[in-house]
Amino acid sequence: MVGTSFAVLLAFVILAGFQTYSGARAAAGSEATAVLDMARTAALFPGAQRDQLRGDLICYGRAVVREEWPAMRRGNGSPLVDRWIAAYRALFGRLDVHTTREQLALGELLSLAATRTAGRQQRLDDDTPTIPTPLWLALIFGGSVAVALQISVVDPRERFSVLGPMIAGVAGVVAAGLLVVYFLDHPYQSHTGGIQPSAMRQTLTTVQNLDPGLRPACSPSGLPV
C-alpha cells in the first residue's frame, strides 16, 4: 500500500513537473520568436529608426543570453534586460508613422512586444521551483519507507547475491524518480537537459544576418557602450 501510494504521488508530481518544464521551454521559444519578428517588422520604418530598433533588440537578446540566463539559475532577473526593454519602448514613441504601412507596422510591433513580454514573464516565473517543501518531504519519506519495506520483507536465509540487486533496484528507482522531479522543477539549471538560451542565440544570429553591417550600441554581453 505504501509503495503504491508513493508511486501514484511520484507519477503525479512528475506530470506536474513536466508541464512546468514544457511551459518554460515554450516561453523561451515564444520570446525569441517575438524578438525576431520585431526585428523583421523594423524594416518597414526609415533606415535610421530601423537600425536603432534592431540594435536595441540585439542588445536585449545578448543581455538575455549572457546576463539573465545565469541570473535565473539564482532565481533572479537582469536589470540590464529591463534597460534594453525601456530603450526600445522609448523608440516606439519616436517612430515615424505617417503612412498607413508605418501605422500598421507600429501596431504589429506593439503586439509582438506584448508577446515578448508574456514569454519573458513566464520564463522568469518558471525559474522558481514550484514543488513546495512539504511535498518534497512527503516524496523523500515515501521513498525511504518503500525501500525500508522492501528490506523488511526479505528472507534472511536468502543469499545476499540475490537480495542485494533486488533492494538496490528498488532504491535506484526511488532515487531516479526523485532526480527526475528535481530536474523538471529546475528547468533552467545548467544540468544535462536544462533549457538553454538556444532559441535566443538563433534569433541573434538571424537578426545580425538581416543587416551584417549593423553595429549595436552594446558589448557581446549586452552592456551599453
Predicted regions and their residues:
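Transmembrane signal-anchor/signal-peptide helices with a preference for the extracytoplasmic
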Residues: 5-29, 185
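Solvent-exposed, non-transmembrane helices and loops of integral membrane proteins
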Residues: 39-61, 65, 189-225
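A near-ubiquitous, low-amplitude feature marking generic local secondary-structure context
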Residues: 14, 18, 40, 71, ...
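Structured inter-helical modules in multipass membrane proteins
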Residues: 23-25, 30, 36-128
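Alpha-helical transmembrane anchor segments
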Residues: 128-219
